[in-house]
Amino acid sequence: MRIVVKIGTSTLAHPGGRLNIRHTEALVKVWSDIKNAGHELIIVSSGATGLGVGKLQISRPKDMVTKQAAAAVGQCELMYTYDKLFAEYSHTVAQLLVTWEDFDHPHRLNNLQNTLERLIQLGAVPVINENDPISTEEYSLGDNDRLGALIAKYNHADLLVLLSDIDGLYTADPHTHPEATLIHRVESVTPEIEQLGGGSNSGLGTGGMSAKLTAAKIATGAGVDMVIANGANANVLYDIVDGKDVGTRFVGKNNKSVSYTHLTLPTIYSV
């Protein structure tokens, strides 16, 4: 099974922006085990700006230039951490930084698809993030929930998992409505479901429930199941892969026919 896992800033970092080392180690251990079990894994990782803020010891910037500078610093720490932790389990990571233009232009999209396919063939774990240091408002993807959905759509994933600081989609905001109940299964993202979306609760991230519902529409429209789950427990991914009733599962429509122009790759390695 090909799995795209999107990890949010609030799951990777402490509130001040510093890396949550213990939890990140636990996540990478589970991801490595999932890969050892024979699954193909693509990581879409937020955290660059948040980690950069922590590394630079500044407050969350409001201006774009400082945000981009923080992202440039944080991306180095993010990939250093992933490279070090995955290497402990004999896995190799690869970094891909993308912008909206990479999905908007067919040739660039094709290059992205082919690079990801080759990395997976070679046994690497692609780690993808938006290229925040050079992204402009016009060409920004906005949040990594959407990015994860686009990666899942255009690279024929079977499952997209959004790991965040929430358990899933509720009938109302559980922070203000204690009686709210978790919705375990969504067959279709209807206008009624979309009305349940809200803003981002984390001071470090950008994607709230509304962004996750947008991602669900993209993924399920391409035939990809999507699950929103709380990443506080690293082992939750085992239950999701096993099909257990955890978080909120958005059921993919029965079609895998997405716009996908795939160039024939030369077979240069036997993997």
PLM features: what roles do these ranges have?
Residues 262-271:
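Single conserved hydrophobic/aromatic residue that forms the stacking wall/gate
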Residues 10, 101, 253-255, 268:
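Generic structural motif
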Residues 1-221, 225, 231-232:
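Nucleotide/pyrophosphate-binding catalytic subdomain
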Residues 213, 217-260:
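Anionic-ligand-binding alpha/beta catalytic cores of soluble enzymes and soluble regulatory domains
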